[in-house]
Amino acid sequence: MQRIMLRAKLHRVTVTQADLNYEGSCGIDQDLLDAADMKEFEKIELYNVNNGERFSTYIIKGERGSGEISLNGAAARRAHLGDQLIICTYAPMTDEEIATYKPKVILVNEKNGIKEIKKV
């Protein structure tokens, strides 16, 4: 049996851009993607801390070092500039994998720069 488990989380990143007319997706600073081992076009779940919205989309690469968290297309309706989001990826795992696995949690500063990388 497999269970769907948290793989990585960007905790309380701040929305820096929103473009309703873009085709869709969430742009994320490449530094954050590398730290969390998230990949372009990977499905993500987003949780808006400010309004409680929960939605999913996919990743596109943002400029390295920019602090970018951009919501595009329909996702742009789910948050305002300055809102804080929790962005998660999940993966199927067996009980044997779960026994030794620890997800990555990336904590950021007010400019979406990496403050701490934890395995929880």
Curated annotation (Swiss-Prot):
Its cofactor is pyruvate. Pfam families: Asp_decarbox. Pathway: Cofactor biosynthesis; (R)-pantothenate biosynthesis; beta-alanine from L-aspartate: step 1/1. Substrate binds at residues 57, 73-75. It comes from the Bacteria. Catalyzes the pyruvoyl-dependent decarboxylation of aspartate to produce beta-alanine. Heterooctamer of four alpha and four beta subunits. This is Aspartate 1-decarboxylase. It comes from Cupriavidus taiwanensis (strain DSM 17343 / BCRC 17206 / CCUG 44338 / CIP 107171 / LMG 19424 / R1). The gene is panD.
